[in-house]
A protein has these predicted regions:
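Alpha-helical structural signal in soluble globular domains
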Residues: 25, 29, 48-51, 85, ...
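N-terminal Rossmann-like dinucleotide-binding module
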Residues: 1-51
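Conserved small/polar residues in nucleotide/adenosyl-binding loops
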Residues: 163-168
């Protein structure tokens, strides 16, 4: 992608929780112009029009030719199909994690990105979180030997996950 003085025209496909977050952040960036969002849910689409002053597309394929880059925030089972459509349309893409539902689809998306010469990235956004960056420094400097993390989430299906690792056990 060539540097440009004009804002990059971007779109978001899927405006559930993560897609809404992407649209919100993109609408605030001076180097990005949120052209539109695509989602089959008309109610969410109308809310996005009001909130982000952008277009809403019921069919994501109508958004593809209008933008340079797209955030894909649809359910994982649709990542492959939507990702291929965007890459084949010449769009740079950010695909929410995981990249695809299985290894075969992931490899297919990587091959399509390479063939299209488009930029593609998986949305591992936590790596930019200041707390995670500092923790990464601490772990790599071997300043701790035990790490316990708890994830708290309003989403019942993701709540109460517990991960522990004790370096002394290894």
């Amino acid at each position: 992608m060539q540097p440009t003085s004009s804002p990059v025209k971007v779109g978001v496909i899927g405006i559930g929780n993560m897609g809404w977050h992407h649209a919100r952040v993109l609408s605030l960036l001076k180097d990005a112009n949120l052209i539109g969002v695509a989602d089959p849910n008309e109610e969410r689409g109308k809310l996005a029009i009001d909130q982000f002053q952008c277009e809403w597309f019921k069919d994501y394929k109508d958004l593809i030719p209008k933008v340079d880059a797209i955030c894909i925030a649809v359910p994982t089972l649709l990542h492959h199909k939507v990702g291929l459509d965007c890459l084949n349309g010449g769009n740079n893409v950010l695909i929410e994690k995981p990249i695809a539902a299985n290894e075969l689809e992931a490899k297919s998306l990587i091959e399509a990105a390479n063939a299209s010469k488009c930029l593609s990235q998986v949305g591992h956004i936590e790596r930019f979180n200041p707390a995670f960056r500092e923790l990464n420094n601490i772990v790599h400097n071997e300043e701790i030997v035990v790490l316990e993390a708890r994830r708290h989430s309003p989403h019942a299906d993701r709540a109460c996950l517990l991960y522990t690792s004790d370096a002394a056990d290894e």
